[in-house]
């Protein structure tokens, strides 16, 4: 269970974009936090995808 976060810091889920296009089964997701005031746009980070075994672009999902 996620704890209730007060203030501008929110928990976001990052999902791999390249994995969806590859058609392989499974999904790569990371959970992180971001400051809503400093980062108003959706977060995009390069993270390791264990299924594809390489660094891929992960985007914030709603």
From Swiss-Prot:
- Whichever gene encodes this chain, its name is rpmG
Keyword Cytoplasm listed: no
Gene Ontology cellular component annotations, sorted alphabetically: cytoplasm; ribonucleoprotein complex; ribosome
Q: What is this protein called?
A: Large ribosomal subunit protein bL33
Q: Which residues form a coiled coil?
A: none
Q: Does the keyword ATP-binding apply?
A: no
Pfam families according to UniProt: Ribosomal_L33 (PF00471)
**To which species is this protein native?**
Porphyromonas gingivalis (strain ATCC BAA-308 / W83)
Q: Which GO terms describe its molecular function?
A: structural constituent of ribosome
Q: Which GO terms describe its biological process?
A: translation
Keywords, ordered alphabetically:
Ribonucleoprotein, Ribosomal protein
Gene3D superfamilies, A to Z: Ribosomal protein L33 (2.20.28.120)
Tell me which family the UniProt entry assigns to this protein.
Answer: Belongs to the bacterial ribosomal protein bL33 family.
